[in-house]
Amino acid sequence: MDYDSYQHYFYDYDCGEDFYRSTAPSEDIWKKFELVPSPPTSPPWGLGPGAGDPAPGIGPPEPWPGGCTGDEAESRGHSKGWGRNYASIIRRDCMWSGFSARERLERAVSDRLAPGAPRGNPPKASAAPDCTPSLEAGNPAPAAPCPLGEPKTQACSGSESPSDSENEEIDVVTVEKRQSLGIRKPVTITVRADPLDPCMKHFHISIHQQQHNYAARFPPESCSQEEASERGPQEEVLERDAAGEKEDEEDEEIVSPPPVESEAAQSCHPKPVSSDTEDVTKRKNHNFLERKRRNDLRSRFLALRDQVPTLASCSKAPKVVILSKALEYLQALVGAEKRMATEKRQLRCRQQQLQKRIAYLTGY
């Protein structure tokens, strides 16, 4: 089995771009099979005092099945835990991590956001007992984070478990917050389910209050309590200052003499008209103008009705009837005017012809 030929199936090379993506462990289960070599931070099993078998159920170590045999340190780390029962270990890890991922995340976030927890040392919660068998290292090396030059593992996880004695713990590391949004608090969780398994199980979940994560619930009320505890002292100081200012104002009001001159000046000037009286006067003016407009309109309709011959005797004719009859009467008058104009032109032509006839007869 060639390790390089199948590496792109198990590991994402562009981890920086995918860092703030909210991906649940259960949704991306192939991340649990990514073949990432862990740094050799612990001494070999045979060198430390009290070193024995790595685990009671694992036989002699076999070489790493991939093709990464060039580096001695990596081959040493690969050959330690990859025994005959690696398939059962992977199956048990996948089964239990799928169920307990949400509980781990919630417990880690609640411990991280607790108001009483120190910020320098992140809290560590023990992993589920069914996930990994217990292991006692012979001579564990002192805890030290991985250097910044580590490829792939540092970019994805943020930090790793420094020694094999801490393989059963979950390291919660706070990632640098983005400057654009102060509310967003990404949390990266790195889990090594099996201390003898060189395959590092990575999954990172960015928890943001503005971006909904369907795999995780809202953070507990400890976040709101922390904000309240931060705002509490400031609010108390502001309330004390406000109370002190009120007491000073009351003292000044008691000590200061009554303003006699201002009261006398106010008594001399008439009081301004209130807004109620202004509204009443405006309403009266509006009603008067509206009544006048209606009376004028009614009188005009009555005059138009009197001009129409067919409606002169109808005292209660509606306005629509008055307008329609007036239109018909107007059209009739216009037609009669045109007819009379044509008759007038004809009569004038006839007159001119008669005058010429008379002039012709008188010439003889």
UniProtKB/Swiss-Prot annotation:
bHLH domain mapped to chain residues: 281-333
Stored Gene3D superfamilies: Helix-loop-helix DNA-binding domain
Cellular component GO terms held in the UniProt record: chromatin; chromosome; nucleoplasm
Comp. bias intervals (Basic and acidic residues): 228-245
MF terms (GO), sorted A to Z: DNA binding; DNA-binding transcription factor activity, RNA polymerase II-specific; protein dimerization activity; RNA polymerase II cis-regulatory region sequence-specific DNA binding
PROSITE patterns: BHLH
Pfam families assigned to the protein according to its UniProt record, in alphabetical order: HLH, Myc_N
Matching InterPro entries: bHLH_dom, HLH_DNA-bd_sf, Myc_transcription_factors, Tscrpt_reg_Myc, Tscrpt_reg_Myc_N
Region (Disordered): 41-81, 111-172, 219-285
UniProt-annotated location(s): Nucleus
Name of the protein described by the UniProt record: Protein L-Myc
Organism: Homo sapiens
Lineage: Eukaryota, Metazoa, Chordata, Craniata, Vertebrata
